[in-house]
């Protein structure tokens, strides 16, 4: 599998971080999430613990929590909730939803789901996934 995301580095950006598989979101981020797009990894983070994209174990924020914690405007659960996950487009996998993951730009779940551009690549500019 080839993940194409943000900047360099295996976890800090690119493969898993910065819009990568485990990061996703408008601002991206690795396993811990963070940034404007909210963390989709295990830690969440960003604007109000999840930010626009929500996600992570804690979830919360504008896009709703997509992780195990849920919360926020759209609610959560394992796959659903938020503007994208279960709302506009439906979330897939553990991360799901957010403004892009399954919503505006599509998204294929995993632990992070898509970002604004959707897909495993996530991130603001999208990203490409090849199986």
From Swiss-Prot:
Cellular compartment(s): Secreted
Keyword annotations: Amidation, Antibiotic, Antimicrobial, Fungicide, Immunity, Innate immunity, Secreted
Keyword Secreted recorded: yes
The organism's place on the tree of life at top rank: Eukaryota
Cellular component aspect of the GO annotation: extracellular region
Lysine amide found at: 130
Expressing tissues: Expressed in hemocytes and secreted into the plasma following bacterial immune challenge.
Keyword Secreted: yes
Covalent S-S links between cysteines: none
GO biological process terms on file: antibacterial humoral response; antifungal humoral response; innate immune response; killing of cells of another organism
Family: Belongs to the glycine-rich peptide family.
Role played: Antimicrobial protein. Strong activity against the Gram-negative bacterium E.coli SBS363 and yeast C.albicans. No detectable activity against the Gram-positive bacterium M.luteus.
UniProt name for this protein: Acanthoscurrin-2
Gene assigned in the entry: acantho2
